[in-house]
């Protein structure tokens, strides 16, 4: 099943193309979501690749798991370069909530559950103000050393299964041998 936010981006792209606007995608060019958009739009640009300066109007969408602050910064820059920027760039609500929670976390360690290949998981690790740990499997989790951490927060990337999250919580709560 496709995420409703991703479906909304695809509808937005179709609308931008119908308006005759060149489409700029903010995201990782190798991410499945960005590749899917590019497959629908011939000649789409992936930031920082941009339409020529003589183009006056552009349409912008973003990978839904991008850092919301980074997307806003890039869109602001595009507004300075082009006369009209029709933006439908948005980060999915769950991703934004996770990013905000990580930014506001006051502990001294954060465990981010998710694959090392997940851009969403990597972004959560990047924006944390404290020491971060990442685990995508129980084997990776068991190799981590939390002994120097007083307050550990736990979050997960968008595609991390709830069952893995629950398994990790149960393992962390076990009595230490």
Label each region the model flagged.
Residues 1-177:
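The feature marks the mature, well-folded catalytic cores of soluble enzymes
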